Amino acid sequence: MEIFNTVASLKNFVAHARAERKTIGLVPTMGALHRGHISLIHRAVAECDICVASVFVNPTQFNDKRDLECYPRTPEADAAVLAEAGCHAVFMPSVEEVYPEPDTRVFDLGSVAEVMEGKHRPGHFNGVAQVVSKLFMMVEPDKAYFGEKDFQQIAVIRSMVNLLGLPVTIVACPIIREEDGLALSSRNVRLGSEERAIAPSIARILGQSRTLRPAHTPEAVTRWVTESLNALPHLQVEYFEIVDGNSLQRIDNWQDTDHAVGCITVYCGEVRLIDNIKYED
């Protein structure tokens, strides 16, 4: 596996791959890699001739300076994990390499970027669009792979791709979970022992909420999930919304969509965890 720290060296690698008519799959990450990331690498390796990963903690998508400072960084371990997973190249740049000048672009990402995470983390999705668009222009991938734990982010990136007219297919990959149900996240390492013990309750309560669907409205299910989690120690729901999986607009009736998704953000102690559940039949 080759490791690149500069845009020029990455573009040179991509140019050679393109000259050989090879397809390229891109897996953008912020590092602190876990089995969820590796599942994306395996999918890209299976579907494309060349798999390129990026490891970059993007400062423009953090609206909380402390969250940026606390985000785990393990570049040496990440490189080893990627090599073992069969990745062909990894881009591990400095902030200055990605942003030689401040990125002042403001994207019109539509309503999918204004709700849920967009409402609670102002500027977050514009920062995501800034860095992902840069990566897409550097690598020019045929496909790019993202995990469905970040369900709203995938919708936002698809909106950006349509806005810019980029020739890349966005591939959404299933959530990977611990045996106890907790969605894998780089932030999980920050959980204390008591918090880690209670965190799987998020997925458990979401799973139980499926059984309420036949006899309860989305509003009633939303209320039950929120109250059930808030009643547990260390957990505080920031939001839980049941939305149409395409528009991400809240639904009042199950009949409003055949693709209902419940999206949640919960503080477990001081660690912000996200998850989601599909309510499809």
UniProtKB/Swiss-Prot annotation:
EC number: 6.3.2.1
UniProt entry keywords in alphabetical sequence: ATP-binding, Cytoplasm, Ligase, Nucleotide-binding, Pantothenate biosynthesis
Species this protein is from: Porphyromonas gingivalis (strain ATCC 33277 / DSM 20709 / CIP 103683 / JCM 12257 / NCTC 11834 / 2561)
Subcellular localization(s) per the UniProt record: Cytoplasm
GO molecular function per UniProt: ATP binding; pantoate-beta-alanine ligase activity
Entry similarity comment: Belongs to the pantothenate synthetase family.
Misc remark: The reaction proceeds by a bi uni uni bi ping pong mechanism.
GO biological process, alphabetically ordered: pantothenate biosynthetic process
Xref: PANTHER family: CYTIDYLATE KINASE/PANTOATE-BETA-ALANINE LIGASE, PANTOATE--BETA-ALANINE LIGASE
Protein name (record): Pantothenate synthetase
UniProt keyword annotation of Cytoplasm present: yes
Subunit structure, interactors included: Homodimer.
Catalysed conversion reaction: (R)-pantoate + beta-alanine + ATP = (R)-pantothenate + AMP + diphosphate + H(+)
